[in-house]
Amino acid sequence: MNCLFYFVPVASVIALFFAWLFYHQMKKENEGTPTMKEIAQYVREGAMAYLKQQYKVVGIVFIILAVLFSVLAFGFGVQNKWVPFAFLTGGFFSALAGYVGMRTATYASARTANAVSKSLNSGLKLAFRSGAVMGLTVVGLGLLDISIWWVILNAFVHEASESQTLVVITTTMLTFGMGASTQALFARVGGGIYTKAADVGADIVGKEEQDFPEDDPRNPATIADNVGDNVGDVAGMGADLYESYCGSVLATMALGASAFFGDVDAQMRAILAPMMIAAIGVVLSIIGIYAVKTKEGAGLQQLLKSLSVGTNLSAVLIAVLTFVVFYMLGFGNWWQLSLSVIAGLLAGVIIGKATEYYTSHSYKPTQNLAESSQTGPATVIINGIGLGMISTCIPVVTIVVAILISYLCATGFSFDPAYISNGLYGISIAAVGMLSTLGITLATDAYGPIADNAGGNAQMSELDPEVRHRTDTLDALGNTTAATGKGFAIGSAALTALALLASYIEEIKIGLQHVGTAVLQVGDKVVNVAEATIPQIVDYYQVNLMNPRVLAGVFVGAMMAFLFCGMTMNAVGRAAQKMVVEVRRQFKEIKGILEGKQRPDYKRCVEISTKAAQHEMVAPALTAIIVPVVVGIILGEAGVMGLLIGGLGAGFILAIFLANSGGAWDNAKKYVEDGHFGGKNSVNHHATVVGDTVGDPFKDTSGPSLNILIKLMSMVSIVMAGLIVMIHG
């Protein structure tokens, strides 16, 4: 059975090889005219300058946290000695994936614009395969990190029994998710603040005050806006999904080791299954990537169908092969567990389709939102908020159904508390299923900003109108894939956070053993800590709704979602104000900009966004890290469980609302720009621009950042469980 593990590192190497191949194929393409190259260079320099500055800040935070974890591990003995090192590698690989994705995207945009001048299909394939570099790098590095730690810990960790060794190994591996979570938080929050400070600033002065079109080279903030697309939607999205991907696999491994404690063969099967499904998903994603192509002159719906062919092919194949994996591993309930995986896969598809329905201007909700512009910006805002609230229904019901189906399939269709560990394993394997085709799913997400930048490059380089029409078509597709990608990221974050919540209970068991607690008094029974089940741990800490500590934690967790959103929203507002002041200053002081005779000072706007993002991201990030520790110290283990439940419930629903309201406002504006309700530069268009400007931080800063918040709070709780147990017992 152990031989099957080696397929996992092989799959990671295959993913990284194809990422390298697609990158070099992209670099061989012509970058276009000297103007196109110059604009691409501006964007590339701005993106890399931001990334360099961000990694300096993140590096300092990582050093401080690594020292703290070292003190807890080597000084107080409340953590495994490997935790500080696992934490650092998790952050390093996440940062490396972001760097590779950003570098690829900034090189691909001008080449995509140039390829589109030949044919629409050439542009689509180039942009999509460049996006695939990000997708395959994330899954490749994620599986590589998991493989390395599995080999290292198997060689060095030896507990009293083989069963206990597997539990310690998997719970230790789970802590490298803390590194990925911390890096993801800074990438998402910092990237979101950067991109929306530039975007909102560019829109307020450029579109609303000067009637400039999108990506007008006369707008000083336009380069910063294009840099922001890469910073937020490539590096930020990549770090977010890297965290979910690794977190779901690692949580499933930890829950599998716990659920089948005492039966080493069953433990090994449960540990290998998520790694095998993820590895097979990598190979099938590559097959799906090669299936993406389109006809010349294709419209938005045809392009969407082209991308769907690749993602659907990968999803169908993984659904079929999941049955083979569980059967080969020797699970008695192999077909039921396969249904748990399929439940996760289908949930991802349904959430994506629901997001598309509520945010694409091909459907009634966004068309009706555009129609409301006839009575001014106030009704656009009101209807957009209402649309976002209603849009939460389908994703929430979908996740609820997926949780119940995956739980029941894993327990033999029983709610008996004796099988709760098996049920939680089923839920976590559903999260792995949802993320199994991340290689191609993330490719469609990263495609969006590449196509958007290609359109911006074509506009600023004043290319032929036909080329710009083609880049606009690819850009419209990118907006839709970006919106559905956000829905997918939120759904996967919810399932992953639920799996991490269950893993927190396992980490408490390890913490109890570290402080020397051998047995627990649970009701009338005396239970060995190493063999205690999840219901027994929950019972011991009185985790129920009658416990005021749990209730207090739930309220604090729900509040955290709104506090975090408020902090990130205000951060964008403050940064955008600085950008607006700078753009107005340039229009006033640099003569000839408005006439197109003098080039604006793009670099100054890039610097403003970079500094604002670095400064403003610190407070929300520290809040997310510190609050779970403070709640644990004050309210104990039961309070932390309440915190995680409250944060997950409120954060998941709020994230969907923000992402879909913002996406609908964006596409309502585009629907008007396509000639409906007065078209560009009409009064109605100005009303939708206001909606789009308000929606920018909704969909690209606060909404996506909540994904990280609900996972990071779980990860912080897991890593600090030993300290909380030492304080409270």
What do the PLM-derived regions correspond to, one by one?
Residues 1-729:
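Hydrophobic packing and interface segments
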